[in-house]
Amino acid sequence: QVAEEAARLFLHENALNTAAFPSLGEIQAELCAWTADLLHGPPEAAGFLTSGGTESILCAVEAARERAAAERGVVDPEIVLARSAHAAFHKAAHLFGLRTRVVPVTDDWTADVDAVADAVGPSTALVVASAPQYPQGVVDPVAEMAGLADSVGANCHVDACMGGFVLPFATDEDPDAWGSPPWDLGVDGVTSISADIHKLGYAPKGVSVLLHRSRELRRYQTFVFDDWLGGRYATPNLQGTRSGLPMAAAWAVVRHLGRDGYRRLVRATLETADRIRAGVRAVDGLSVPGDPRHHLLSITADPAADEPVNIPALGEALAARHWHLDRQGPPDGLHLTVSAGNVPTVNEWLADLSDAVVEARERGNIDPADDGSYATLE
């Protein structure tokens, strides 16, 4: 109700020009400041709101490219990123003319720091770290990766679109069980970070925060043009028109919940995720790769089991019970994003998982579906 009422009040406002709608400028500034404080940003940290995680990533890549060209004269810029990094970084490289240097992950599914060190060089514009990475839900070694970026004067962006509104509260609630190594703007060498309020911040789609360590770094994100007949045109992201609706709704939700509210939601979420992981690992033939501590995890076949479960068959059996889990791979897996909304149904899900495993074994092996984790092709 809080989000809906705020959205109704800002149904027609446009954040393209915050001089015309000053309340949207104040909303953006307050959300960026609140998030910067949460993510240990220095006093000079600054940011903008975007429409979501992908746009935040696109803007971070563009800013890194512009800085590398302006300050170091880089003409053939590269992004160094792990194979686990979000596909939006490859989309950004495609759109903005950067090359990608993809490095492997280690046995624990985090970025291989030695491989990052080998890949970083004079053409590096950006090193990407994830907190957590999406496929297996583990946090990259951000401090080491940021140090390597800083050694060549490159940006280091932390993709915390999934974790920005979870990891800080997880550490507060139980640092031993749910804590992470340093990963945010408190890490030297991290130049930008993104966190989606419309994911585990529980705001409506779509609003994300993209923060830079300083206003000086943020300016590389902004496009300014006045050599036409319409006056000065300046935009901080890829959109022109920006709906005020999601911005206002996000502001209302953050103000309503506050840190205490988010702590309660995160505790409930992570207790539920722990139950799910334990339930999956208790099934002979299934595995949870890596050591995810938070709200993301993948279900894969256990290669050491006498009778591994066929994951595509398991996915179809769960779908028949009205549980939609994104398919991913390699390796073949089913992806889960746990939120506070899953708390009331975790017992039902675990019971259905047991039944679905039996059905999958009876059905036998089927080939992976030829579709994406999240894709719209028509």
Where are these regions (language model features)?
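Glycine- and Gly-Pro-enriched alpha-helical subdomains that act as flexible
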Residues: 66, 72, 274, 298-299
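Short Gly/Ser/Thr- and Asp/Glu-enriched loop/turn motifs at secondary-structure junctions
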Residues: 43-44, 290-296, 329-334
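Active-site C-terminal subdomain of aminotransferase-like
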Residues: 172, 176-294, 300-305, 377-378
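Active-site nucleophile and cofactor-binding loops and adjacent substrate-binding regions
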Residues: 23-24, 48-54, 81-83, 290, ...
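Cytochrome P450 catalytic-domain "roof"
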Residues: 35-43, 360
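Non-catalytic terminal extensions of PLP-dependent enzymes
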Residues: 1-25, 29, 33, 263-266, ...
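Short glycine/serine- and small hydrophobic-enriched flexible loop segments
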Residues: 37, 62-66, 251-256
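Conserved PLP-enzyme active-site core in the AAT-like
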Residues: 44, 51-224, 228-232
